[in-house]
Amino acid sequence: ARNFEPDTIVLMNVLEHLAEPIASLKVLSSIAGPSCKLLIVVPAIQALYNRMDSEAGHYLRYNRKLLIKHHIEAGWNVVDARYFNFPGIFGWVLAGYLSESNKSESALNAKSTNWMIRVYDKLFIGLSSFTDCFTPRMAGLSLCCVSTKSSSNHS
């Protein structure tokens, strides 16, 4: 039987749902092929944590330093970690504020939240692409990290 050794692993908005993210990253390292690349996207900036995060089952929102630390502790070599979607911060804060003012419905399914997402998608995606060129190390609604398997973890 052939062992499964992926050459690429992608986690999109998964790590923030895990109670033991470092242990999970170690498991991924143990199954990864020797030249495996790991791409992870997580919500960023703990100060933005609000009712929508809680309802979505998020344990936390990451900052760059913590995400890199978790990767290193799990045996991954971080190639790059950068924030993106800077304008989205303002929409997230507004949606969080509105969800606090109307606790009778789910923050994730609120009409105001869905309306704001549609407006953002139509008006601000282009702005986000522009601002991401200038803010990758400073701030953004999300954080992306690319890592490779540590040479000390090769089988």
Identify the role of each PLM range:
Residues 1-50, 64-68, 145-150:
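Conserved SAM-binding loop
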Residues 2, 88-155:
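A C-terminal cap/extension of S-adenosyl-L-methionine-dependent methyltransferases
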Residues 12, 54-55, 78:
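Conserved short-loop catalytic and cofactor-binding motifs
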Residues 18, 61, 137-138:
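Short, solvent-exposed loop/helix junctions and linker helices
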Residues 23-28, 53-56, 94-96:
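Short, glycine/charged-enriched secondary-structure capping and boundary segments
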Residues 47-50, 87-91:
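Short catalytic/ligand-binding loop motif for oxyanion handling, primarily in non-cytosolic enzymes
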Residues 51-70, 83-84:
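Acceptor-substrate binding/catalytic loop of class I
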Residues 76-87:
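Conserved S-adenosyl-L-methionine
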